[in-house]
Curated annotation (Swiss-Prot):
Lineage, highest ranks first: Bacteria, Pseudomonadati, Pseudomonadota, Gammaproteobacteria, Pasteurellales
Domain of life of the organism encoding this protein: Bacteria
Coiled coil spans: none
Protein family membership: Belongs to the UPF0352 family.
Parts of the chain that traverse the membrane: none
Name of the protein in question: UPF0352 protein Asuc_0778
One Pfam family from the record: DUF1414
SS bonds (residue pairs): none
Amino acid sequence: MAKNSKYSDKQVDAVLHDMIAVLEKHQAPVELSLIVLGNMVTNLLASSVGTHQQAALAQAFSDALMNSVKK
């Protein structure tokens, strides 16, 4: 999703592979997968980001997601 990142493609791909494997293990359809991933993002924001930064980071994430699906 991000074009510029401090993380290597190898790091991102490894985590992505593991997350896809979990969703496949549970035979999660697209809707359930999106619900789980959305809840994960919400949990990360709530547990790891200061309250005053949560909305801005959520908006930046949303914008990046929208940009990644635009054609």
